Amino acid sequence: MNQSLFHHSKQQEYCPQCGAPLQIKQGKKGLFLGCSAYPECDYLRPLQRSEHKVLKTLDEICPKCGNLLQLKQGSFGMFIGCSHYPECDFVVREESESEEKITCPECKTGHLISRRGRQGKIFYGCDNFPKCKFSLPAKPYSVPCPTCHFPLSLLKSEDGEKQIFQCANKTCRHIFEQ
């Protein structure tokens, strides 16, 4: 059997820190290039994946680095980001002015904002992350719990004028009507 079938034809890359060959490795966040001399050399670089398809280059300037912004199609839908990604990771965030800003009950200085997790699921977390790790699985409401007086609740169901809430305090989880 022809041995060339078992070798890739792409040119070998070498570690910029120690000169050893780079290897494709699997991590919890996907594939990356890592130094074959690990653990003596800890160089690694994420593999460039074409997961963001550029739909249009815009006339807007990136406020972080000064390059042009682009409309891109990602795995969670369309978004506007910097044309110099991954060097610049600026992404335009949608901010709805109509929503009230809810203060984080844990750190008292941050506000809870909508975020998207690794699997694309939306959750609400403190904008002081990573200093404050408070998060909720659904949209919080400023409805205090009648049992423990925690300031936030999650809307469980809505039926006409009747609303069922659940306390957002992980140690309480009391369900009540409003």
Curated annotation (Swiss-Prot):
One of its GO terms (cellular component) is chromosome. GO terms for molecular function: DNA binding; DNA topoisomerase type I (single strand cut, ATP-independent) activity. It comes from the Bacteria. GO terms for biological process: DNA topological change. InterPro entries: Topo_IA (IPR000380), Topo_IA_Znf (IPR013498). Pfam families: Zn_ribbon_Top1. Gene3D superfamilies: Bacterial Topoisomerase I, domain 1. To E.coli YrdD. This is Uncharacterized protein HI_0656.1. The lineage of its organism: Bacteria, Pseudomonadati, Pseudomonadota, Gammaproteobacteria, Pasteurellales.
